[in-house]
Curated annotation (Swiss-Prot):
One of its GO terms (molecular function) is GTP binding. GO terms for cellular component: plasma membrane. Its EC number is 3.6.5.n1. The gene is lepA. CDD domains: EF4_II, EF4_III, LepA, lepA_C. Belongs to the TRAFAC class translation factor GTPase superfamily. Classic translation factor GTPase family. LepA subfamily. Required for accurate and efficient protein synthesis under certain stress conditions. May act as a fidelity factor of the translation reaction, by catalyzing a one-codon backward translocation of tRNAs on improperly translocated ribosomes. Back-translocation proceeds from a post-translocation (POST) complex to a pre-translocation (PRE) complex, thus giving elongation factor G a second chance to translocate the tRNAs correctly. Binds to ribosomes in a GTP-dependent manner. It comes from Cutibacterium acnes (strain DSM 16379 / KPA171202) (Propionibacterium acnes). This is Elongation factor 4.
């Protein structure tokens, strides 16, 4: 029996589902295996992590962009169509995940049988439950020698409230149990519901930029139908476009005449900018537009800012072009030019979170062959002045110096940490050091614990995750989401060299930590900056008050070398002359900070973390 054609598929045979899993629990491998078993992928063209198209995705083993694949699967003589929507698993991309979940009716909760449930799995599971999806619990990697299937099955059953026997066991690597899983999807996931003759409404759950064809928009049709060559309207921007190509992905793009209720596919309109087709927006017919959008659209909001500067100043235009190109593929990326007296021309770039920042930087360096320096990541602070005005500070150099400051507000996040119970003490200690407020602590099983903390985002962006991993031998996992703002006692610490502030090294820190930050930074720069002909003071200051100082000793010539014996007044004359020369040099001399010193000092201030 041949598979139904796109555009004329009965919604009753469609099943839309996604896979929720923590990094490394085998989501992409399971997706590969499903593609092979349903015959969409033949053995010859199969490669590991078939759906992860970016090199970085394959190398790091993570999924950054969502993908959607249509697979036929026959049950009792009826060919069903399974649309698998592959979602990113990382906390930075939780908005993308929530949009992908909106496009589904069911979700596979995939858990590694050796490791058990992790924080991101749990966070995405809650998103799926909020979206009212049918959850199918699955244990993966049952072929591993270290798999503890029964224990983790009980854990999952306890969290989602099902019976242990309902937890399916598969091995994505060998293919064991995957056919049963496909049957279960057909049996359990509800068919999509929608009104076929209503005005079209389709949810955009991802958009990617293709160099040759412009933006490819992935959509899930909720009501009505979208047809080839008709005019469509984006409801959040009001922009109208013509559909140049429409089709499904199986697993390469297959053009079709249209898409109907419940179907998942792609559109190409010839638009060149991803910001024109925003994730979470609703697409409708321009001729007969829908009254109401599907709701839930949010504009992605950067949480973390960092300055990116080319090491070689002549690469600045290339960096601009590279960011322009990346933004075509990543609507959440925002940037504006900035200049630094120390680092020259560059950009202030806003990211969704730390992983997003790392990936963008790595893609700039790898795909565009740029050498970059990035300044320490900072968050957006709101400074309320006594005259009632508010200043948003994304860069320490924007911190107001004149006028009286009433209060400074900083973003906070609710963090969930899952860890083996033996590490509770060290995790609580870390969270307390980072100004956290404990919100709750629950045992998921006798030896796994869920710790909830409210933390300032600025305390997480540096190296919280690395510290957490090193304190728990890599077993703890972290998930966080924003929770508004709070007032805090924050100050701007300036680093002065020979009395001049170095803008790239300024930082906004909590008053309690300002002293240790200043001392550590001054000590670090003392090691890094080469000795000059004159004495150079390295100072850390809050406003006009110096809180720490180190002195880089001058290099001096031995002016007494030519005096054999001789009179003391002769020696004193030579020393006084040298001293006067050094003093004059200090007034006119400027200190050049070598680039290596910057890179080392900005390396997220490791020495400031010495416990």
């Amino acid at each position: 029996m041949s598979a139904p054609q796109p555009g004329s598929t009965d919604p009753a045979v469609i099943r839309n589902f996604c896979i929720i899993a923590h990094i490394d629990h085998g989501k992409s491998t399971l997706a590969d295996r499903m593609l092979q078993i349903t015959g969409v992928l033949d053995e010859r063209s199969a490669r590991a992590q078939y759906l992860d198209r970016m090199d970085i995705e394959r190398e790091r083993g993570i999924t950054i962009k969502s993908q959607a694949v249509r697979m036929p699967w026959e049950v009792d003589g009826v060919t069903h169509l399974l649309n698998m929507i592959d979602t990113p698993g990382h906390v930075d991309f939780s908005y993308e995940v929530s949009r992908s979940l909106q496009a589904c009716e069911g979700a596979i909760l995939l858990v590694d049988a050796a490791q058990g449930i992790e924080a991101q799995t749990l966070a995405n599971l809650y998103l799926a439950l909020e979206a009212d999806l049918e959850i199918i619990p699955v244990l993966n990697k049952i072929d591993l020698p270290g798999a503890e299937s029964d224990r983790h099955a009980a854990e999952i059953a306890g969290i989602i409230g099902c019976d242990e026997s309902e937890v399916l066991r598969v091995s994505a690597k060998t293919g064991e149990g995957v056919s049963d899983l496909l049957d279960t999807i057909v049996a359990k996931v509800p068919a999509p519901e929608g009104v076929a003759d209503a005005p079209a409404r389709a949810l955009i759950f991802d958009s990617v930029y293709d160099t040759y064809r412009g933006v490819v928009t992935y959509v899930r049709v909720v009501d009505g139908a979208l047809r080839h060559r008709e005019k469509i309207l984006m409801m959040s921007t009001g922009a109208a476009h013509e559909v140049l190509e429409i089709g499904v992905i199986s697993p390469e793009m297959v053009p079709a005449q249209g898409l109907s209720v419940g179907e998942v596919g792609y559109l190409i309109t010839g638009v060149k900018d991803v910001r024109q087709s925003r994730v979470g927006d609703t697409v409708t017919n321009a001729s007969k537009p829908s009254e109401k959008d599907l709701g839930g659209y949010q504009h992605p909001k950067p949480m973390v800012y960092s300055g990116l500067f080319p090491i070689d100043a002549k690469d600045f235009p290339d960096l601009r072009d590279a960011l322009d190109k990346l933004q075509l593929n990543d609507a959440a990326l925002v940037y504006e030019p900035e200049t630094s007296t120390a680092l020259g021309f560059g950009f202030r770039v806003g990211f969704l979170g730390l992983l997003h920042m790392e990936i963008v930087r790595e893609r700039l360096e790898r795909e565009f062959d740029l050498d970059l320096i990035s300044t320490a990541p900072s968050v957006v602070h709101h400074v309320l002045m006594e005259d009632g005005s508010t200043v948003a500070v994304t860069n320490p150099s924007e911190y107001p110096t004149s006028g009286r400051i009433a209060e400074v507000r900083e973003p906070i996040v609710d963090a969930t940490i899952l860890s083996p119970a033996e590490y509770i003490g060290t995790i609580l200690e870390l969270c307390q050091q980072r100004r956290g407020v404990q919100q709750g602590l629950d045992y998921l099983s006798s030896d796994r614990v869920e710790i909830r903390y409210r933390l300032p985002l600025s305390e997480i962006v540096f190296d919280f995750f690395d510290q957490l991993k090193s304190r728990t031998k890599g077993y703890a996992s972290l998930d966080y989401h924003e929770a508004g703002e709070q007032a805090a006692d924050l100050v701007k610490v300036d680093i002065l060299l020979n009395g001049d502030p170095v803008d790239a090294l300024s930082s906004i820190v909590h008053r309690d930590k300002s002293y240790s930050y200043g001392v550590a930074m001054a000590a670090k720069l003392k090691e890094l900056i080469p000795r000059q002909q004159f004495e150079v003071p390295v100072q850390a200051a809050i406003g006009a008050r110096v809180i720490a100082r180190e002195t880089i000793r001058a290099v001096r010539k031995d002016v007494l070398a030519k005096c054999y014996g001789g009179d003391i007044s002769r020696k004193r004359k030579l020393l006084e002359k040298q001293k006067a020369g050094k003093k004059r040099m200090k007034v006119v001399g400027s200190v050049e900070v070598p680039q290596e010193a910057f890179v080392a000092a900005l390396r997220t201030g490791e020495s400031t973390e010495k416990k």
